């Protein structure tokens, strides 16, 4: 298990990817304690002085003007968690719940939330014990924070709801016992601090980012294999072309292709003096299209990296001045827009890959047997696999519609503009699955095309990509049940089998 000493506000994208990928043992850096304690003392002073402060001794949302008596403050926090745990849908996977919890711990530990170390330590204990609260997929509009998902996360601390441990559902009290805990009684402000925030939205989008990075890497490898399979040119990847334009994503993408393709190969030397002048756009313009996608990934990663370390609670406690100020950091618009841009990139990666698959099907364009199989007519080869790729790419065009432009007023129009960031983030997973399927078919097709080049080898790195597939999926000498081969290629891509072929430093979290 990975061990991480958390210094609040300093999580890196690489650490976030690791937290999403596998269980982690957290320890809070000792430097966090003074700020946490000071914020709690500030809240306690406000109560002692009988000052009115939103979320501490008032109602919530449209009920913010309702003053709550001091003897009801603990009940207020418990009622808040119970009433807001109103999500619906399938439970989130452990990897997502873990990421949400670590993001919440990171935010609360910065010392602007007025929540005791005891509560933060309880969340840490759950993470370390691999006890993951039941959080339904749906129920948040991304403002005022991810209230329903985070309420479900918080239920377990109160001894309510349920949690998963080693694949089994336990009651909250059983789950707490596994982590060596007992149910907590929340103090003033603590329920609101737990519920307010963009941690679910951010986790949803971060998963989409990690998937998109792996898809980008796979698309570069598959695109390089396709260049070789159809006897394409290396000239479009010449650094001078891309430096002349100046787009950094394009420049770096072209460099990735040069690294994978090398200066030459047996395949490229076999058509060195051919009379073909230019390749189709799906081959020639890969640096331009994939470079634009890389730029979107990097920009989204920057936004999400900031949000992962943000304080998105409301109100915020500024202990040094003794102030508690209401604002709107819970509004997840930055996350929604980042997710929307990731959707564009994921859709385009799949769209370009589908065009290369189609190119390989056409004997006039590819100089390969129709549908990549010999004895055509008796054999249909990749004919319907390409149709599947087209269906997946088409689905993604609809799914890529932006969510951040949508809004529905909630809480009796008090919360009259919302981000829809959770929906923006979670559709990325389906889109990634679709694009992974398209790339799997291209990978199968490009390797088949290279096989048909009668023993010619491509570059050393692309041969690794080829053999990674061929170690699991055999060449097609005749038609066979196709779906299992696509499933195996998808499985390999989901494991990141091609991600390691990219040079270090290209992708934000790798």
Curated annotation (Swiss-Prot):
> What EC number(s) does this enzyme carry?
4.3.1.3
Q: Which residues carry this modification: 2,3-didehydroalanine (Ser)?
A: 144
Q: Name one GO biological process term.
A: L-histidine catabolic process to glutamate and formamide
Q: Where in the cell is it found?
A: Cytoplasm
- SUPFAM superfamilies, per database record: L-aspartase-like
Catalytic activity, per the record?
L-histidine = trans-urocanate + NH4(+)
One cellular component term (GO) for this entry is: cytoplasm
The pathway it acts in is: Amino-acid degradation; L-histidine degradation into L-glutamate; N-formimidoyl-L-glutamate from L-histidine: step 1/3
Task: Describe what upregulates or represses it.
Answer: By histidine and urocanate.
Organism of this sequence: Pseudomonas putida
Its gene name is hutH
Protein name, as recorded: Histidine ammonia-lyase
- Family per UniProt? Belongs to the PAL/histidase family.
Recorded coiled-coil stretches: none
What are the protein's GO molecular function terms?
A: histidine ammonia-lyase activity
What's the short name of a Pfam family annotated to this entry?
Lyase_aromatic
Enzyme class, one word?
A: lyase
**Top-level taxon in the UniProt lineage:** Bacteria
Covalent cross-link 5-imidazolinone (Ala-Gly), where: 143-145
Quaternary structure annotation from Swiss-Prot or TrEMBL? Homotetramer.
Q: Which UniProt keywords apply?
A: Cytoplasm, Histidine metabolism, Lyase
Q: How is it modified after translation?
A: Contains an active site 4-methylidene-imidazol-5-one (MIO), which is formed autocatalytically by cyclization and dehydration of residues Ala-Ser-Gly.
